[in-house]
Amino acid sequence: MSNTVDKKAFEWLNGNQLSYDIWNNKYRYKGESFDLWLQRVSGGNAEIKRLIFEKKFLFGGRTLSNRGTGLASLNNCYSSGYVEDTLEDIMQVNKNIALTYKAEGGQGLSLSKIRPKGALIKDRFESEGIVPFMDMFNKTTESIMQGSSRRGALMMSLDIWHKEAESFIKIKSDLNKINKANLSLEIDREFMQIIKDYYEGKIGEDYTISYNGKISYDVQPIKLYKLLCEHACKYAEPGVLFTDRLRNYNLMEYVIDFQIETTNPCGEQPLPKHGACGLCSINLSEYVVNPFTENSQIDFAALKEDLFYVVEAMDDIIDENLPFHALQEQCDVATKFRNLGIGVMGIHDMLIKMGIVYGSDESIRVVRELMHFVFKNAILSSSRLAGERGKFPGYDSAILDSSIFNNVKWETTEIAEIKEKGLRNSTLLSIAPTGSIGTMLNISTGIEPWFAFSYFRNTKSLGNKEESYEVWAPIAEEAKKYGYDHTLVTSKDITWKQHIDMQAAAQEFVDTAISKTINMPKETTPEEVEQVYLYAWERGLKGCTIYVEGSRDPILSNEKSSEPNPSNKFVSTKAPKRPVELEADFYTIKYKGEQFTVVVGLMENKPYEIFAYQNNIELNLKDHKGKIIKVSNNHYKYVSEYLTIKNLLLQFNNVEEKTATLYPSQLLRHGVEIKYIIKTMKKVDGNIASFTAAICRVLSKYTAKEVTKETCPECGENLIMEQGCCKCMNCGYSKCG
């Protein structure tokens, strides 16, 4: 980051402050000039330098940030594959992901081989299952995030037939648990066929499959599927990975040495164990000639020529990055298979320039034909490069038998050329979120539609003002100018079937995968989500992520708030009226040899009031639930199946105890976050230090239940979910880099 404004870069980005901030804060190295930046990230390649300057192409975030600096990896993401069911391997994976984060890469791993909770360890002890290890991997991701300029990114997946699938589905219902990882369920054809049979009336909801082995258990697929859809509707996770399509629909389908195990964090790269993805994206909107006219069309000749330069440049990155992988195994896999991840962005802008409405039948046809062209010519470019540089070491002629290869319309001469030269790369296309680079160019990201064509930007992150101003996407202004308003649909205007059909059209000719989010309205029901996942599977998607508006607490708003920013204004609050009865939690706490009773009254499952006192006689009572009944002012009765306390206020031993419970109760009622109450109470010393410590210990049990909005770690604004990834429209931050 540099405070010196580079005028050339500012002009290149059309004077857009947000775009410039992204370039300056994320991709500029030590205040370098725009010309030096262009030279560094292009590696001196004149054609790539031209494509970047023309905004037709950009490398992925890690390459833009790190190329030529010698600092860290040029690859965005990696895969650890299956975590084996041994303590040694589990701990090794934890170390490996930490080292990968240090190198600025993300990680994906599958928990499917880890024995479930209750399974025996050495015929003596029962396993605690996957959850403790999920927590460990999450903590590692969080801790490395604190010490790096790039935040750790993690995907954990689990086979839906695993005994702990239900726990896996439910775990994110607590928004503070596993908050540094994306979760996806691995779902095979057998499971989805059962779901399809159910909706066709062939089987009932109680249909059960029994597993007998080291541990026996029953799976009820229909009920499990409904639970999955309910939680996806409420919490936007887990996502789903359709494993038969994910692992087999690629060029390496019949190559035994190449076994896909899971994906990178955003899901656009199914990878083998220790696989890596180098990412880049072509801005298709810049290939439209005669835009906003009846003669608009894609310049296929230019696109074909440029595709070779892109494949060549990405192949260079593989060799250049070998010294920067965190693990030798990652280096070995990169050398053997030479994976590429060439993606696209600006699809929606492209369609607008051609007068085509995103999601329409025509748009689906255009995207399908376009991706067929891109994939075919990427293969031909890789084959041409193989003729110059040699085949990738893991090449096998069985590639020509793969389903996706044979879906391409080939000329006889083209097939002959590929047979003769082979391929330089095992994978070619991968459509990533492009949250940061797409926002930097001020275009639609990946294959997503625009979330909003205008939004309010808080200028506080740019200067020290407290005002917002409305920002319009340049494409929208152009569309209005030329009378193309009918093309200005947003993600909210597009049905879930249209979202899926667009993704399916592209997926047919993307040999890895696509990161995309199906945005759905607030009133969406779990029953609708059930139909979404089924349709996505039937249409051949490799994975599916949904986002119901309002789930996981708010996404970014495209409406200006009528209220001042609450973080900058002092606001008085009014406590909700206390009902006669409150549910309550009863605790006995031992602290420094003394026993205390703490009773917490709950309103809507959140602490509303607290009563506490030191016990003169030690109680032998377990923690339990009861009720606090307000009999009259200064008379609060506690009742449960274990005991009755006629008046809680008469239990205080002194005025200090009464005061020490009165004040936190007032703070709770007025909505003060528990963590701040605890922080303040810990400052108390003297005669009642042990008493307040006991209260703090109880209150800390509720901090994990406090739900906070998902906000940008850079500027504090709300995030939007797009292409399976959280990004900020205010400062350009993207969770996926």
Locations of regions flagged by a protein language model:
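Active-site cavity-forming subdomains of large catalytic enzyme subunits
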Residues: 4-14, 75-300, 323-333, 378, ...
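Catalytic alpha/beta core of large soluble enzyme barrels
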Residues: 260-263, 267-270, 315-322, 404, ...
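Short cysteine-rich clusters marking metal-coordination/redox-active sites
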Residues: 712-715, 728
